[in-house]
Amino acid sequence: LRRAPGGGSDGGHEEGRITYNPGLAAEALLMQSAKAAGVPEPEVFYVLAPDDGLGEGFIMSWLQGEALGARIVRSPELAEIRPKLAYQCGQILARIHAIDLHATGLDQCLHTLTPADYVHTTWDRYKAFKTPQPMIDYAGRWLLDHLPVGLEMALVHNDFRNGNLMISPNGVVAVLDWEVAHIGDPMRDLG
């Protein structure tokens, strides 16, 4: 069972934040869409409805694996799969970025964040500190003057990293924590 803390709503946007949480119903749809595209995910059995009286959430299958990065890099049980994980992650990201946003309905429940959105929001936050740093000023202005244009937007997990991947001796068994996924530049998942 995946629920919001306190059983309430987990979606929304906090003023001044760059990322948006699409909510648990959207997270369930993300996992279902990713699984249908060949991304390893738990099976989502049921998305809670308001009539259920249990708050927002969903029920999914239990998967066996390890998500703690320190254990993944040291566990003798995972020694054989470790050299193959980078390749598996590349395959998984390619599948995520190729998901048809319109056909899955994700375009209706996810926010779009462009590189320009990130640069402008970060620049505005920096300026609010009113402590000029010449190199940051130079870099910020350069980024503002060289924003990418004409990018093809895709589904972005936005937190694809050790700790959000469940690993077993067979490889990646699940991509976890979709709460900051959005539509944007897929390069966000590579940095």
Model-predicted segments: where are they?
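ATP-binding pocket architecture of kinase catalytic cores
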Residues: L1-L155
